[in-house]
UniProtKB/Swiss-Prot annotation:
GO biological process, one term: DNA recombination
Any matching Pfam family: Ku
Keyword DNA damage recorded: yes
Record domain Ku: where: 9-176
InterPro entries: Ku70/Ku80_beta-barrel_dom (IPR006164), Prok_Ku (IPR009187), SPOC-like_C_dom_sf (IPR016194)
Protein family: Belongs to the prokaryotic Ku family.
Protein name: Non-homologous end joining protein Ku
Upper lineage: Bacteria, Bacillati, Bacillota, Clostridia, Eubacteriales
Record-level Gene Ontology MF annotations: double-stranded DNA binding
Tree of life domain: Bacteria
Region (Disordered): 250-285
Keyword set, alphabetical order: DNA damage, DNA recombination, DNA repair, DNA-binding
PANTHER family found in the cross-reference section: NON-HOMOLOGOUS END JOINING PROTEIN KU (PTHR41251:SF1)
Length: 285
């Protein structure tokens, strides 16, 4: 697995050298922009509007606009000097309960694996965190940014690091609908609908259906097949809330009964009988 960062986990006087690997990947289709007339790729030119010239990469520097059209120049050495003391350490600040973290704070997941000489220290930290049921809040510098992070243990022996947003980066939404109160009957029916739809989390049953359709469309176009563009669905009509709840509950009740019947059928032992010719015949075959 590709290593994206190397450093060490630091807590107290203990240091555990680790490597970081991306835990997720996207399966999006990446399209190129082409010139409609000749189908050649569009080129994006970095041009200075003042000098009216194309600017090469080695002549591009960083600047921060502190007021309109006024910049303070930031040299790479300036930024590197700030990062140097922090760049190779995951500093644990606190150990907390995972349930205390609102998922809105999570950004991206990474695996942490131990360096060859740190297997025992890594396993020790994993075991201690598993036994106490705690996760760690830490800070690290990666890609010119200091990240807040959560370290947690999965399968008792693998450490996952989740980068997190700082509180100042979380937007807040005011609930302008607090003056509306559903009736007790509506709440009871909504709860029943939720109970009907409740199920264990099985991630393998969820699919990116749009991606599958895009893949199929690309394959058809590459092979020269014709295709039909499906009509856009009609916008949903506003219906009575109680009627919608009743209909939804009835639909989920029917589906639950059907699933139960299918499960019972699968669990029944298959009975066999002897035919006049001595062959075994399976009932229902």
């Amino acid at each position: 697995m590709h290593t994206v960062w190397k450093g060490s986990i630091s807590f107290g006087l203990v240091n555990v050298p680790v490597k970081m690997h991306a835990a997720t990947e996207t399966h999006e289709f990446h399209f190129n922009y082409l010139h409609k007339d000749c189908h050649n790729r569009i080129r994006y030119i970095k041009k200075c509007p003042h000098c009216e010239v194309e600017v090469a990469a080695e002549n591009i520097i960083k600047g921060y606009e502190y007021e309109k059209d006024h910049y303070v120049i930031m040299e790479e050495e300036d930024l590197a000097s700030l990062e140097a003391p922090l760049s190779r350490s995951i500093d644990i600040l606190d150990f907390i309960d995972l349930s205390d973290i609102d998922p809105i704070y999570y950004q991206k997941s990474y695996y942490l694996s131990p360096e060859e000489a740190a297997h025992k220290a890594y396993k020790l930290l994993c075991q201690a965190m598993s036994d106490t049921g705690k996760v760690a809040i830490a800070k690290l510098t990666m890609r010119s940014k200091q990240h807040l992070a959560c370290l947690r243990i999965i399968d008792q022996s693998i450490m996952v690091l989740e980068t997190m947003y700082y509180p100042a980066e979380i937007r807040h939404l005011e609930a302008s609908w607090d003056n509306v109160s559903p009736t007790d009957t509506e709440i009871a029916m909504a709860r029943q609908l939720i109970e009907n739809l409740a199920a264990p989390f099985a991630p393998e049953k969820y699919r990116d259906e749009l991606r599958e359709q895009v893949k199929e469309l690309i394959e058809k176009k590459v092979s020269g097949e014709t295709y039909r563009v499906a009509a856009a669905p009609e916008p949903g009509k506003v219906v009575d809330l109680m009627e919608a709840l009743r209909a939804s509950i009835a639909m989920t009740d029917q589906k639950k009964q059907q699933n139960t019947a299918e499960s019972e059928t699968e669990e029944k032992p298959t009975k066999s009988t002897l035919t006049p010719r001595g062959r075994r015949k399976v009932k229902g075959a």
